[in-house]
């Protein structure tokens, strides 16, 4: 499944695509778990294991695609009025994606363990030593040499067949792919961790701005209070001056009136 970059820069469509992928990842994880439960039962078959591998790889690709979509969503331009709502939406998508990835990685690890157990059983039944064969040609040459020098020996438990080798190499290839996919998911978790960290920085910045705003408000209130006090004192002083002037005028008027009479 290939990644289709963007949806015309429309945040609503991009958010819908992300939500849809998250739902698919969750559903695929459930299906992978159901398939894992069938391994080692009468329903187990090479076809079932192939379906398991394909489903796992498809889900892994969905996870990579969703990671890119979320990054794109976070980089979309936004107006100040939309910023808060956009951040809430992104936080929700990141949280849902993290939950779905956690469940997916859990079944990934289970699948890898099942494959390793299968290889171990085949090796044990075929008397194959070592963990992972580095050179399959050596084992094939060994089988050929044993078949030529001991054609009469037909003890199945002590021989490794071509089918055994094929199964071992297929399963080991599957294990390596699973481990690589698990590492891919780990990288996505790191990306999500960085997003959460950046969101924390934004929150810290917002809180700092709020605190600064509160300080400025307090300072402004103090300045207003001082201004009000000054204004009250000014009015009081003005009233006293006016009163003195009135009294002075009255005294002068009385003196003038007395002189005239």
From Swiss-Prot:
Transmembrane segments: 239-259
Region (Disordered): 129-148
Native source organism of the sequence: Homo sapiens (Human)
Function in brief: May be involved in protein trafficking from the plasma membrane to the early endosome (EE) as well as in homotypic fusion of endocytic organelles. Mediates the endocytic trafficking from early endosomes to late endosomes and lysosomes.
Pfam families: SNARE, Syntaxin_2
Tissue-wise expression: Highest expression is found in placenta followed by heart, skeletal muscle, kidney and brain. Low expression is found in pancreas, lung and liver.
UniProt modified residues of type Phosphoserine: 45, 75, 125-126, 129, 205
SUPFAM superfamilies in UniProt: t-snare proteins
Membrane topology: Single-pass type IV membrane protein
Primary localization: membrane
Protein name: Syntaxin-7
Subunit structure: Forms a SNARE complex with VTI1B, STX8 and VAMP8 which functions in the homotypic fusion of late endosomes. Component of the SNARE complex composed of STX7, STX8, VAMP7 and VTI1B that is required for heterotypic fusion of late endosomes with lysosomes. Interacts with VPS11, VPS16 and VPS18. Interacts with VPS33A. Interacts with TPC1.
Subcellular location: Early endosome membrane
Residue ranges that the UniProt entry lists as topological domain Vesicular: 260-261
Single annotated GO MF: SNARE binding
One Gene Ontology cellular component: late endosome
Keywords of the record: Acetylation, Coiled coil, Endosome, Membrane, Phosphoprotein, Transmembrane, Transmembrane helix
